[in-house]
């Protein structure tokens, strides 16, 4: 027993003290995914969407890896993300803020060399005013709404914007862009509708480069590329197109420790509300991850984890900090206190978990909690 404790202490010293879940991020696989997209897109440039802390994987580490692969265009959602990322990248890397700026952030943004994506006349006026105050031309990107009804200049604002550009401006437009709402569905009619609307916008605003394709858009064909694509989920190993074979390499794996095992008789109630009742004598394991760690509560009695390739179904409700699984299929003693089970990895993909949870891989990936020890290789 004492030797086991000493081994445990040594192992703890080499990883993270107190962690009971280990999120492995394969930066080499990330680089290979980027190179694959670059090869598909050439000669079109490939940027990288690193918003939400690079989908939960660590924006600084991810961005530096992609920079080393030649990426120079990085997209975040909020200005605060750009502020955090800026010191991690060389000055020739451009950081774009997709949501644009809230009033009062314009001067700081300009002084840090961060580029806002302007989505409305209100944002345009604020950025133009900042340029006047600083007495210099400031760069920006214009985003247009082509049918998603979320962000971007609406149709009714385009005429006034075009007039402002014709009259001369202290804002340098680097390119114009829009976002595809249904690119993950290659057969969606909305893809063609948005393409047609973007073509009309290009006619109204001639002479500007275009950025259009997201991860799914890369696989819709060259017509959707523009001069700069903006892949996100595909970089991190997620499937860019629903229902199609995933061409990307997995980047993330997650293993979680067992806290306790037990054997219960038939008729035992498991978890909050006694929602699961065993039909036979059952061996159970409680693992150290719950909905606070990114295992959605809707996986209750639906999802699973794996141990050496054996599927271990979740039984009862997922709790905040723990989840109980049925280990009866394993030989007795195969899984014990401290053993690690696979939540995400070789036997279970992001898409598998998302399907069981009734959601999308983006939500699963970005929801992986900060109690995991993130290990990079």
Swiss-Prot record:
Protein name per UniProt: Alanine racemase, catabolic
Cofactor(s), names only, from the UniProt record: pyridoxal 5'-phosphate
Modified residues (N6-(pyridoxal phosphate)lysine): 51
EC numbers on record: 5.1.1.1
SUPFAM superfamilies reported in the protein's UniProt record: Alanine racemase C-terminal domain-like, PLP-binding barrel
Biological process terms in GO annotation: D-alanine biosynthetic process
UniProt keyword list: Isomerase, Plasmid, Pyridoxal phosphate
CDD domains for this protein: PLPDE_III_AR
Swiss-Prot/TrEMBL catalytic activity: L-alanine = D-alanine
Coiled-coil region: none
Function: Isomerizes L-alanine to D-alanine which is then oxidized to pyruvate by DadA.
Organism: Rhizobium johnstonii (strain DSM 114642 / LMG 32736 / 3841) (Rhizobium leguminosarum bv. viciae)
């Amino acid at each position: 027993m004492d030797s086991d404790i000493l081994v445990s202490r040594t192992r703890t010293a080499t990883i993270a003290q107190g962690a009971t879940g280990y999120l492995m991020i394969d930066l080499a696989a990330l680089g290979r995914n980027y190179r694959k997209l670059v090869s598909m897109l050439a000669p079109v440039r490939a940027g990288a969407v690193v918003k939400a802390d690079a989908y939960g994987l660590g924006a600084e580490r991810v961005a530096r890896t992609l920079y080393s692969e030649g990426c120079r265009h990085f997209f975040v959602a909020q200005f605060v993300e750009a502020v955090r990322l800026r010191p991690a990248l060389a000055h020739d890397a451009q950081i774009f803020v997709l949501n644009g700026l809230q009033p009062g952030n314009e001067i700081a943004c300009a002084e840090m060399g961060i580029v806002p994506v302007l989505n409305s006349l209100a944002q345009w006026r604020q950025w133009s005013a900042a340029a006047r105050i600083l007495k210099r031309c400031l760069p920006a990107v214009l985003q247009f709404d082509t049918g998603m009804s979320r962000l971007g200049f609406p149709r009714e604002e385009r005429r006034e914007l075009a007039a402002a550009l014709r009259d001369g401006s202290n804002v340098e437009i680097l390119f114009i862009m829009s976002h595809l709402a249904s690119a993950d569905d290659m057969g969606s009619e909305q893809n063609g509708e948005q393409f047609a609307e973007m073509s009309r916008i290009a006619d109204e605003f001639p002479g500007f480069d275009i950025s259009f394709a997201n991860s799914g858009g890369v696989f819709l064909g060259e017509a959707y590329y523009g001069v700069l694509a903006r892949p996100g989920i595909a970089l991190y190993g997620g499937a860019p197109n629903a229902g199609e074979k995933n061409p990307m390499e997995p980047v993330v794996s997650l293993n979680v420790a067992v806290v306790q095992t037990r054997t219960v008789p038939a008729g035992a109630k498991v978890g909050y509300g006694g929602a699961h009742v065993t039909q036979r004598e059952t061996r159970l394991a409680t693992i150290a991850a719950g909905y606070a760690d990114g295992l959605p509560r809707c996986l209750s009695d639906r999802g699973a984890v794996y141990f050496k390739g054996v599927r271990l179904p979740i039984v009862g409700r997922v709790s905040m900090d723990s989840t109980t699984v049925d280990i009866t299929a394993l030989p007795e003693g195969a899984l014990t206190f401290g053993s690690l089970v696979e939540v995400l990895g070789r036997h279970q993909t992001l898409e598998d978990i998302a399907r069981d949870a009734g959601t999308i891989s983006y939500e699963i990936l970005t929801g992986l909690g900060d109690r995991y020890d993130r290990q990079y290789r």
